[in-house]
Design a protein with these regions (language model features):
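Conserved class I S-adenosyl-L-methionine
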Residues: 24-32
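A short SAM/SAH-binding and catalytic strip from SAM-dependent methyltransferases
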Residues: 90-98
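A short, aliphatic-rich alpha-helical micro-motif
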Residues: 20-21, 41, 86
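A short acidic, Gly/Pro-enriched loop at the edge of an enzyme's catalytic core
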Residues: 80-91
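Conserved alpha-helix/loop element of class I SAM-dependent methyltransferases that forms part
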Residues: 5-24
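Class I SAM-dependent methyltransferase SAM/SAH-binding core
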Residues: 33-82
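Conserved acidic residues
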Residues: 24, 45, 90
Length: 98
């Protein structure tokens, strides 16, 4: 999927206006290639980012900034396959996901 450029970073501003990622354990459903993950990862405590597309996850892993690798876990996985223990995540994020 091609994504339109966002030179004014409107998407990131809106994301931070609506959610406080500071110190949170985040579940990102439909992370794709990680394009949105990088925009909040520096504030989150930890992230599990899932997507069913193995190619997108491979791209996300390849493009992941070194300073964020310890806090982001990328998985090739569908949401329906996720085993979510009670209260494991503080926040769930879905973007362009059905």
């Amino acid at each position: 999927m091609s994504v339109l450029p966002d030179p004014e970073d409107t998407e990131t501003k809106a994301l931070h206006d609506y959610a406080d990622f500071s110190g949170k354990r985040v579940l990102e459903i439909g992370c794709g290639d990680g394009r949105l993950t990088w925009r909040y990862a520096d504030r989150a405590a930890s992230i599990v980012a899932i997507d069913p597309d193995a190619d997108d996850i491979a791209t996300a892993l390849e493009d992941c900034p070194n300073d964020l690798r310890d806090k982001i876990e990328f998985r090739t996985q569908r949401f329906e396959e996720l085993d979510i223990p009670t209260e494991k995540f503080d926040l769930a994020l879905l973007s362009w996901s059905l």
